[in-house]
UniProtKB/Swiss-Prot annotation:
Cited function: Bidirectionally degrades single-stranded DNA into large acid-insoluble oligonucleotides, which are then degraded further into small acid-soluble oligonucleotides.
MF GO annotations: exodeoxyribonuclease VII activity
Family indicated by similarity: Belongs to the XseB family.
Organism, as annotated: Caulobacter vibrioides (strain NA1000 / CB15N) (Caulobacter crescentus)
Name of the protein this chain belongs to: Exodeoxyribonuclease 7 small subunit
EC number(s) from the headed UniProt entry: 3.1.11.6
GO biological process, alphabetically ordered: DNA catabolic process
Lineage: Bacteria, Pseudomonadati, Pseudomonadota, Alphaproteobacteria, Caulobacterales
Compartments, record wording: Cytoplasm
Reaction catalysis annotation: Exonucleolytic cleavage in either 5'- to 3'- or 3'- to 5'-direction to yield nucleoside 5'-phosphates
Pfam families documented for this protein: Exonuc_VII_S
Length: 84
């Protein structure tokens, strides 16, 4: 079983878009019900690793986003954005 916290190297090298595309194809294959049991288990595990990778990429992007605020005296500063 693949540890979602430590995805395989081939997944770690994927961009968000590439990982999401692979994850979408896995979901389609699983939903079709046409895959054999062992294949279903294998691609489910890969899908879990891809999901974790996508979440990690999204979190990294979120942390990069900043909001511009006008401070006292008209000073402009950047602060981490809050998405609550």
């Amino acid at each position: 079983m693949t540890d979602a916290a430590n995805p395989p190297a081939d997944i770690s090298a994927l961009s968000f878009e590439e990982a999401l595309s692979q994850l979408e194809r896995i979901v389609q294959e699983l939903e079709s019900g046409q895959a054999a049991l062992e294949r279903s288990i294998d691609i489910y595990e890969r899908g879990a690793a891809l999901k974790a990778h996508c979440e990690k990429k999204l979190e990294a992007a979120r942390l990069k986003v900043e909001k511009i605020v006008l401070g006292q005296g008209g000073a402009v500063a950047a602060e981490p954005a809050e998405f609550n």
